[in-house]
């Protein structure tokens, strides 16, 4: 039986994906005549406590050999999630979502399709679309001022830049992350030409605010750069110098918790006698929950006593972060291009909306990104479905689902499965959000991509097993080929690619802290960097990579063949995971060869002969 319905196919659903509130959606069915008489109805329900299913009778559009065609147009008025299936109104049959997103006939309840409806005025920064990001873990990128003294006596300086980060527990069994390799803002400034040479447009920096660990997610002072990294003035200089290279800087904002060792909480007493922990009359006391039912006597992030949680709805905290002259305002006016919100799905929607207001008050082109590990449209939290991607909160999110699908594909997952997972995210996310989603293969929170691709899975084994491991020889060589394929996909999917520092030279490492080694500046691995530079140049020159629709043409036998269809140009990408050369037909009718473990990208002007531009990176 042919496909009855597939929301990825423009014949069955237009427009593709999420829609703005008030927009009309056209849905069509193709019913084989062997099913007999049917009277199909669209059954649509908005998710909400008082919302009920609404039945829309579909009109008969005519026949083709052995098939009857039906359609319906509906206007979706309010932002939210809508779910739908089709009732045939005969013999209790319905059409529900089956494998590969195709509709199947069922006599029972089944999976529905989703339509995300977002705010009609939702816009995201145009300056982000079509660009390239690069993530830097500041302590581990480049030491611009060498052998500088430690600003606090409890910091341990690591002069050997090839050393493995500390991983052994201390005498109490804890990990204090107290080893510092000395990376700083000056080091980033020095490497701006290197970054621009790779086509980087934006830097995403892990936290730079004063904090007493090398990762700096335990903020001690929101308004000052950590003194080991530099000064506030040096940050402003970095922003100005980066702008000369066409590079913006996005900061990491950690607003769900502070450090216990901070001027706000001050459990350790580093900041005198003030702070919420030591002074019941502290202006910061209301930011925290003190109660004997909690370990340590206060609520902390996932039970880590060094990370006391804040009440994000406390008026004084909200004003401190989002008010005029507050944290967001201060850093954007110092030159930052935007913020990435750490653990965004643990922040209340109302707080995120206030952060958005603060960001956009400075400029609509300032960027607000959220850390969300799953499909951001379907996340639950605070006892309700999260709304931060519907137009009043985040601009977009970190795209972990793409990362997982791409890495699994280059390792051997069926191409069709990867394509369906990617299309599902594209379908669910509002267009302004998917076009600015941050696509990556590695981060400071995950194993490095080359390790995932080429090395043995850790499978829950501890740091002692992970320490010192790396692949060499044939495994390394094949891993680099697969990594190149993976980045070719990441650079050409909807969204913006983000390269994690060191991936371009094949750095390896399992999870924290092994994925956070110092950048190996004396590495001789040069094969991936020119490819990434070419891919960045392609993104900059082809408008289809800004907002072009994704259409999968073939996903089978280790072949992933898809298009990005723009207003004036169409890019066609063929990735060949197989071990033999393939000859693949293009949409234009021509054919192209693609090498084993290789990819080909063809760009043509819409309405003209192909090969306006031709890229074949073998």
Which role fits each region the language model picked out?
Residues 1-24, 50-135, 141-161, 167-168:
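The feature marks proteins involved in alpha-glucan
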Residues 29, 136, 195, 205, ...:
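Conserved, mostly hydrophobic/aromatic
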Residues 29, 36-48, 53-54, 82-84, ...:
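Beta-strand-rich binding/interaction modules
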Residues 239-248, 256-257, 262-273, 327, ...:
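Active-site-proximal helices and loops of the catalytic beta/alpha 8
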Residues 139, 382-383, 435-471, 487-525:
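Aromatic/acidic polysaccharide-binding cleft in carbohydrate-active enzymes
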Residues 137-201, 208-334, 355-361:
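Substrate-binding/active-site clefts of carbohydrate-active enzymes
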């Amino acid at each position: 039986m042919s496909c009855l319905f597939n929301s990825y196919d423009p014949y069955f659903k237009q427009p593709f994906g999420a829609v703005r509130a008030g927009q009309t959606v056209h849905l069509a069915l193709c019913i084989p005549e062997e099913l007999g008489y049917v009277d199909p109805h669209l059954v649509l329900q908005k998710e909400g406590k008082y919302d009920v299913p609404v039945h829309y009778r579909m009109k008969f559009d005519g026949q083709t050999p052995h098939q009857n065609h039906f359609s319906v147009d509906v206007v979706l008025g309010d932002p939210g999630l809508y779910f739908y299936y089709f009732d045939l109104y005969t013999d209790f049959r319905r059409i529900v979502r089956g494998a590969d997103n195709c509709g199947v006939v069922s006599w029972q309840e089944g999976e529905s399709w989703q339509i995300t409806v977002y705010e009609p005025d939702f816009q995201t920064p145009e300056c982000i679309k079509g660009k390239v990001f690069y993530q830097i873990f500041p302590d581990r990128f480049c030491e611009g001022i060498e052998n500088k003294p430690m600003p606090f006596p409890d910091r341990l300086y690591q002069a050997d830049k090839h050393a493995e980060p500390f991983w052994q527990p201390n005498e109490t069994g804890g990990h204090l992350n107290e080893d510092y390799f000395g990376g700083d803002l000056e080091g980033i400034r020095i490497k701006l030409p290197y970054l621009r040479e790779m086509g980087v447009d934006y830097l995403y920096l892990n936290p730079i605010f004063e904090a007493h660990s090398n990762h700096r997610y335990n903020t001690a002072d929101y308004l000052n750069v950590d003194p080991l990294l530099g000064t506030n003035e040096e940050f402003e200089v970095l922003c100005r110098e980066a702008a000369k290279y066409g590079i913006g800087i996005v900061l990491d904002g950690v607003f769900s918790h502070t450090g216990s060792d901070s001027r706000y909480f001050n459990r350790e007493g580093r900041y005198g006698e003030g702070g919420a922990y030591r002074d019941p009359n502290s202006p910061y006391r209301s930011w925290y929950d003190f109660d004997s039912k909690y370990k340590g006597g206060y609520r902390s992030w996932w039970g880590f006593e060094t990370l006391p949680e804040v009440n994000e709805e406390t008026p004084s905290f909200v004003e401190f972060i989002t008010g005029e002259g507050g944290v967001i305002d201060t850093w954007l006016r110092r030159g930052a291009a935007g913020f990435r919100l750490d653990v965004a799905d643990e922040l209340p929607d109302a707080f995120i909306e206030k952060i958005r207001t603060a960001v956009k008050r400075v400029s609509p082109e300032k960027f607000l990104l959220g850390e969300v590990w799953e499909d951001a449209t379907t996340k639950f939290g605070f006892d309700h479905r999260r709304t931060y991607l519907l137009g009043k909160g985040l601009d977009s999110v970190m795209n972990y689902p793409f990362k997982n699908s791409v890495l699994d594909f280059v390792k051997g997952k069926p191409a069709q499965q990867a394509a369906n997972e990617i299309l599902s995210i594209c379908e669910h996310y509002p267009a302004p959000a998917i076009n600015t989603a941050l696509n990556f293969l590695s981060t400071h929170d995950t194993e490095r991509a080359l390790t995932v691709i080429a090395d043995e899975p850790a499978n829950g084994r501890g740091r002692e097993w992970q320490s010192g491991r790396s692949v060499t020889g044939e495994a390394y060589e094949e891993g680099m080929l697969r990594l190149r394929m993976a980045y070719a996909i990441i650079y050409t999917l909807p969204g913006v690619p983000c390269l994690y520092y060191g991936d371009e030279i094949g750095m390896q490492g399992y999870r924290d802290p092994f994925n956070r080694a110092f950048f190996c500046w004396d590495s001789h691995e040069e094969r991936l960097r020119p490819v990434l530079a070419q891919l960045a140049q392609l993104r900059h020159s082809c408008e289809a990579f800004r907002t072009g629709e994704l259409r999968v043409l073939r996903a089978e036998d280790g072949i992933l063949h898809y298009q990005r269809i723009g207003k004036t140009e169409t890019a066609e990408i063929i990735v060949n995971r197989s071990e033999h050369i393939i000859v693949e037909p293009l949409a234009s009718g021509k054919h192209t060869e693609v090498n084993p473990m290789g990819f080909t990208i063809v760009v043509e002007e819409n309405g003209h002969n192909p090969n306006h531009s031709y890229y074949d990176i073998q």
